C-alpha cells in the first residue's frame, strides 16, 4: 500500500517576505539585500559602471536583449534596411513664392488686400416714391395723438387691498413694486381711518396654569429588565450577605471603598475557588434591582461568568440571574371596628328572613318629630319591612309611656285613602291606590331610621291612639 505523502507548500518569495516583515523590522539580512539590490554583486556593478562604459551592448543586470539593434552574427554583415518614408505619398503642394524686399521699398507693409478696402464717402440718398405715413393736420390747437402701439397689447393690472386690522392708517403705504413689461396701470385707494372689525378668535390653550399646587410630572413606563429569559441561568441565593456585601461571596478580598449599589468588577486568577460555589468564575456583578413576582419582593443581580479565555485575552461565559426573596406581600388585614357608644340592639326583619342589628343612636330622626319628644324607652322594638307589591301587611308596635311623663304635641296626620269594598268585586287599576307619601320608589329608598323613629301619635282618653 502506497502511503500518500503530504503536499509540499510553496514557500514565500523574497519580495513577499519583504512586504510583510519590513514594517515590523524582522526581515532577514539576505532578503533585505536582495530586494534593495545591495548585495556584493550589485555593489560591484554600481561602482564599476562609473569607470567603464559598454555603450548600447545591453550588458548589465537587466534582461539580455543585445541592445537596440539586437544580436548580429560576427561572420555576416548587417543587411540593408530600406528607409521608411515618414510622409505618405501625396501630391506636393505648389511652393509659396516669397518676394524679397529691396532697400528702396517702403518699410510699411500693408496686411490688408486692396480689394477689401471700402472707400469712405457720403452715401447717396434714395427717396421712396410709394408708402409712408399719412398725416392729417387740423387747424385747432389740440395736439394730435397718434396710436403707435402694436396690436399685441398686454394689459397688466395690480390691485392692493389694505386691512385696517393689521395696517396702521397713519402710515402711507408706497406703491407696490411690479416687475413686468408693457403698459402698466397701477391704482390704489386712498387710505382712510376706519374702525377695526372684531373677528371672533378661538382659544387653543384652555388652561395653562397647573391644576394643583404641586403638579405631578407624568411618569414613563419602566423598562423591562428581562430577568427571566432563556439566556439567563436562574440561581436563588440563601445567604443574607447577598443583600449587603455580595463581594464576600465571590472573593476573599475586602474592597473597603466599593459601593455595592453599582456594578462590581472582579479580576479572578486562573485558579480560584469562590467562597460560595454559586458565584464561581463571576467577573462582573451588575447593580441590584427590586422586583415583585408571585406575591413576593425579590432582590436581583445579574452576573457575568468568565469560564473560558481566548488567545487575545477575551473571557467568554454565560449570564446568571442571582435573586433572593426578601418578604412576601400579604393580603390586607381585616380590622374589626367596635362602636364607641353602646346602644340597644334592634332587629330588622326582611322578606328573606334576615335579621340585622341596627344602631339608632346616630340615625337620622323623623322630620316631623321634636327633639324634646323623642322617647328613649323604646329599646327593644321589632318591626318588619316588605315591598309594596307584597300582600303581607304588618304594623309597628311601640310601647307607650304614661301621660304624666310625656309632652303631647300636635303634628300633621297623613291620611291614606281607601277603596270601599263592594259586591261584586271590580278590577281596580292600579292595584295599589295613590297616596300622598311614597316610601318605595325606583330611584330611592327610605332610610331605616325613619321606620324606627316615628312621630308621636295623638293620645286620647282611655289610652287609645287616634288613627
Curated annotation (Swiss-Prot):
Where does this protein reside within or beyond the cell? Answer: Virion; Host nucleus; Host early endosome; Host Golgi apparatus
The UniProt annotation puts motif Nuclear localization signal at: 1-12, 452-462
Q: What's in the keyword line of the UniProt record?
A: Capsid protein, Cytoplasmic inwards viral transport, Disulfide bond, DNA-binding, Host endosome, Host Golgi apparatus, Host nucleus, Host-virus interaction, Late protein, Microtubular inwards viral transport, Phosphoprotein, Viral penetration into host nucleus, Virion, Virus entry into host cell
| Record keyword Disulfide bond present | yes
Query: What is a GO molecular function of this protein?
Result: DNA binding
For this chain, the annotated S-S bridges are 21-27
A GO cellular component annotated for this chain's UniProt record is: host cell endosome
Q: Which domain of life is it from?
A: Viruses
Post-translational modification, as annotated: Highly phosphorylated.
- State what protein this is by name: Minor capsid protein L2
The protein's organism comes out as Human papillomavirus 40
Lineage summary: Viruses, Monodnaviria, Shotokuvirae, Cossaviricota, Papovaviricetes
UniProt gene name:
L2
Amino acid at each position: 500500500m502506497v502511503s500518500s505523502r503530504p503536499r509540499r507548500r510553496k514557500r514565500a518569495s523574497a519580495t513577499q517576505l519583504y512586504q510583510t516583515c519590513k514594517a515590523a523590522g524582522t526581515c532577514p539580512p539576505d532578503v533585505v539585500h536582495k530586494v534593495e539590490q545591495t548585495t556584493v554583486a550589485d555593489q560591484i556593478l554600481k561602482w564599476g559602471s562609473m569607470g567603464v562604459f559598454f555603450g548600447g551592448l545591453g550588458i548589465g543586470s537587466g534582461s539580455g536583449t543585445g541592445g537596440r539593434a539586437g544580436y548580429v552574427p560576427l561572420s555576416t554583415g548587417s543587411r540593408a534596411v530600406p528607409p521608411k518614408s515618414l510622409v505618405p505619398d501625396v501630391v506636393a503642394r505648389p511652393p509659396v513664392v516669397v518676394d524679397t524686399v529691396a532697400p528702396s521699398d517702403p518699410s510699411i507693409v500693408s496686411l490688408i488686400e486692396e480689394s477689401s478696402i471700402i472707400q469712405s464717402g457720403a452715401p447717396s440718398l434714395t427717396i421712396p416714391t410709394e408708402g409712408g405715413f399719412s398725416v392729417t393736420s387740423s387747424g385747432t390747437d389740440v395736439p394730435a395723438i397718434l396710436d403707435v402701439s402694436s396690436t399685441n397689447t398686454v394689459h397688466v393690472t395690480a390691485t392692493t387691498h389694505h386691512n385696517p386690522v393689521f395696517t396702521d392708517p397713519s402710515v402711507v403705504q408706497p406703491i407696490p413694486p411690479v416687475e413686468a413689461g408693457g403698459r402698466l396701470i397701477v391704482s390704489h385707494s386712498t387710505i382712510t381711518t376706519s374702525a377695526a372689525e372684531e373677528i371672533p378668535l378661538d382659544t387653543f390653550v384652555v388652561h395653562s396654569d397647573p391644576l394643583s399646587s404641586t403638579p405631578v410630572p407624568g411618569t414613563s413606563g419602566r423598562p423591562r429588565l428581562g430577568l427571566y429569559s432563556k439566556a439567563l441561568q436562574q440561581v436563588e441565593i440563601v445567604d443574607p450577605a447577598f443583600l449587603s456585601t455580595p463581594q464576600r461571596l465571590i472573593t476573599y478580598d475586602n474592597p473597603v471603598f466599593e459601593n455595592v449599589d453599582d456594578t462590581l468588577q472582579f479580576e479572578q486568577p486562573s485558579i480560584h475557588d469562590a467562597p460560595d460555589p454559586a458565584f464561581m468564575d463571576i467577573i462582573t456583578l451588575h447593580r441590584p434591582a427590586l422586583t415583585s413576582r408571585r406575591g413576593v419582593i425579590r432582590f436581583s443581580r445579574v452576573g457575568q461568568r468568565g469560564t473560558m479565555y481566548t488567545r487575545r485575552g477575551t473571557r467568554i461565559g454565560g449570564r446568571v440571574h442571582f435573586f433572593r426573596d426578601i418578604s412576601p406581600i400579604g393580603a390586607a388585614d381585616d380590622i374589626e371596628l367596635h362602636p364607641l357608644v353602646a346602644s340597644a340592639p334592634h332587629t330588622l326583619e326582611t322578606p328573606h328572613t334576615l335579621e340585622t342589628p341596627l344602631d339608632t343612636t346616630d340615625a337620622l330622626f323623623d322630620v316631623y318629630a321634636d327633639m324634646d319628644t323623642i322617647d328613649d324607652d323604646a329599646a327593644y322594638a321589632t318591626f318588619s319591612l316588605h315591598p309594596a307589591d307584597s300582600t303581607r301587611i304588618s304594623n309597628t308596635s311601640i310601647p307607650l309611656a304614661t301621660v304624666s311623663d310625656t309632652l303631647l304635641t300636635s303634628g300633621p296626620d297623613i291620611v291614606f285613602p281607601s277603596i270601599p269594598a263592594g259586591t261584586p268585586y271590580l278590577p281596580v287599576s292600579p292595584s295599589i291606590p295613590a297616596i300622598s307619601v311614597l316610601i318605595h320608589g325606583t330611584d330611592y329608598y327610605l332610610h331605616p331610621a325613619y321606620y324606627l323613629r316615628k312621630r308621636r301619635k295623638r293620645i286620647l282618653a282611655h289610652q287609645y291612639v287616634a288613627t
